[in-house]
Design a protein with these regions (language model features):
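Hydrophobic core of transmembrane alpha-helices in multi-pass small-molecule transporters
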Residues: 17, 86, 98-114, 234
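Extracytoplasmic
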Residues: 7-42, 59-63, 149-150
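Juxtamembrane cytosolic amphipathic helices that cap and anchor the N-termini
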Residues: 2-11, 214-233
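Helix-loop-helix hairpin linking two adjacent transmembrane segments in secondary transporters
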Residues: 137-138, 142-190
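Flexible cytoplasmic inter-helical loops of multi-pass small-molecule transporters
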Residues: 185-215
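Cytoplasmic helix-loop-helix junction between adjacent transmembrane helices
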Residues: 103-140
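Short hydrophobic/small-residue motifs within alpha-helical transmembrane segments
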Residues: 50-57, 143-145, 233
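Conserved MFS/SLC helix-loop-helix module at the cytosolic interface between two early adjacent transmembrane helices
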Residues: 58-97
C-alpha cells in the first residue's frame, strides 16, 4: 500500500505550482493589459512585483514560525483563500495602486504559505530516509506551475479579457487547492498512527535540528545577517 506521505507530496506540488505560477510566473502577463487600462507605464506596474518581494521578506519568518506551531491544513487553506481573494480583487481593481496593494499583500501571503516554506516543511515531516527524493519531486510543482499557469491565464485573457481571466483563475485556484488540502493534509505521520517513510521506527536523520528558540522571528528581524541575505535574494 502506498505510503500516505506521497499524497502529501502531491498536494504540496499542487500548492507550489499554483502559488508560484500565479505570483512569480504570471505577473508579466498582467502588466500590459492593466497598464493600458490604467494608463500606467511599465516601471510603475512593476511596483506590484517589488511590493510582493518586500512583503515576502517580512512575512517569511513569521510564516515559518506558524508552520512549526499551527495546523498545516489551516495555514494552507488560508493561503489558498488569500490567492483566490487576491485574484478576485485584482479583477475589480479601479486603479494601479489598488492592484499593487492587493498583489503586494494578499498574493504575497498566499504564495508564502503555499510556497517553499509551507510545502517543504510539511513534506519534510513525512519523510526521513527518503526526504531528498520527496522534496525533489515536490519541487517539480514549481516548474509545472511556471509552464501551465501562465499558459492558462494567457488563454483566458485572450478569450475574455484580463478581468474575467483573473476571476477564472481565482475560482480555479480555490477549487484545485481547498478540497485536497482539507481532505489530505495532516501535520505529521503520528496524526495517522504512522512513522516517517512508512517504516516502523523511522526517525529523523542525523543532523536535522529543530528551530532554536533564539531564532524566533522577533530576534531574527534584528539580525543583520538575515537582512543581508534577504536583500540579496529579494
Amino acid at each position: 500500500m502506498m505510503f500516505y506521505g506521497w499524497r502529501i507530496v502531491v498536494v504540496a506540488m499542487l500548492a507550489l505550482g499554483l502559488s508560484n505560477g500565479l505570483v512569480s510566473y504570471s505577473y508579466g502577463l498582467l502588466v500590459l493589459p492593466l497598464g493600458t487600462e490604467f494608463g500606467a507605464n511599465r516601471m510603475l506596474m512593476m511596483w506590484g512585483l517589488t511590493a510582493s518581494s518586500m512583503a515576502t521578506v517580512l512575512i517569511s519568518p513569521f510564516a515559518g514560525s506558524l508552520m512549526d506551531r499551527r495546523s498545516a491544513r489551516v495555514l494552507f487553506s488560508v493561503g489558498a483563500v488569500c490567492l483566490a481573494l487576491g485574484m478576485s480583487l485584482i479583477a475589480v481593481s479601479r486603479n494601479v495602486w489598488e492592484f499593487i496593494l492587493v498583489f503586494g499583500l494578499l498574493m504575497s501571503v498566499g504564495a508564502t504559505l503555499l510556497g517553499p516554506i509551507g510545502a517543504n516543511t510539511i513534506v519534510a515531516r513525512w519523510f526521513a530516509q527518503r526526504r531528498g527524493r520527496a522534496l525533489g519531486i515536490t519541487a517539480i510543482g514549481t516548474s509545472l506551475g511556471g509552464l501551465l499557469v501562465p499558459l492558462l491565464l494567457q488563454t483566458l485573457i485572450d478569450a475574455y479579457g484580463w478581468r474575467i481571466a483573473c476571476l477564472w483563475m481565482a475560482a480555479i485556484a480555490l477549487l484545485l487547492l481547498l478540497p485536497p488540502i482539507w481532505l489530505v493534509v495532516r501535520n505529521r505521520p503520528a496524526d495517522l498512527g504512522l512513522q516517517p517513510d512508512g517504516q516502523p521506527g523511522a526517525g529523523q536523520p542525523t543532523g536535522v535540528a529543530s528551530l532554536a528558540a533564539g531564532s524566533a522571528p522577533p530576534r531574527l528581524m534584528t539580525d543583520a545577517s538575515f537582512w543581508r541575505i534577504a536583500l540579496a535574494v529579494g
